[in-house]
Amino acid sequence: MTGKAKPKKHTAKEIQAKIDAALTNRGGGKAGIADRTGKEKGGHAKYECPHCKITAPGLKTMQIHHESKHPNIIYEESKLVNLHAVLAPVAESKPKPGIRGSLKK
């Protein structure tokens, strides 16, 4: 049991983790579509495996994945799906009228 009069304090590591979690964009939802598809930064999820649909940033990484996960299937670069060419650019939508944002500024 902790003493009733003693205040509970947070460690510096815990506070830093909270600050990091609050300020870092984790890329979920519509805000992270451009980051996940790799259109803007050019490195995220460029190639897709035709067998298991897992993504990889480059051909060498995809070859390593193929050799470890699909050893009985012949590796062919021509069958890989280039997601940068397939995915259309993200369309910018205008804000809808009558929808108020957060009150927290």
From Swiss-Prot:
Mainly expressed in the epidermis. Induction: By high light. Triggered by the carotenoid metabolite beta-cyclocitral (beta-cc). Coiled coil: none annotated. One of its GO terms (molecular function) is DNA-binding transcription factor activity. Its main location: nucleus. Residues 26-46 are annotated as: Disordered. GO terms for biological process: cellular response to singlet oxygen; cold acclimation; regulation of DNA-templated transcription; regulation of leaf senescence; response to high light intensity; response to photooxidative stress. Residues 36-46 have a biased composition (Basic and acidic residues). GO terms for cellular component: cytoplasm; cytoplasmic stress granule; nucleus. It is found in: Nucleus; Cytoplasm; Cytoplasm, Stress granule. Keywords: Cytoplasm, Nucleus, Stress response. Disruption phenotype: Normal plants under standard growth conditions, but severe symptoms of photooxidative damage under excess light due to a deficient induction of singlet oxygen 1O(2) detoxification reactions, thus leading to pale leaf phenotype, early senescence and lack of anthocyanin accumulation. Increased susceptibility to low temperatures and high photon flux density (PFD) conditions. Increased lipid peroxidation in response to beta-cyclocitral (beta-cc) associated with reduced induction of reactive oxygen species (ROS) responsive genes (e.g. AAA, LTI30, ZAT12 and WRKY40). Altered induction of gene (e.g. Required for acclimation to reactive oxygen species (ROS) responses downstream of beta-cyclocitral (beta-cc) or mediated by dihydroactinidiolide, including singlet oxygen 1O(2) detoxification reactions, especially upon light-mediated photooxidative stress, and leading to programmed cell death. Prevents leaf senescence. Involved in cold acclimation. This is Protein METHYLENE BLUE SENSITIVITY 1. It comes from Arabidopsis thaliana.
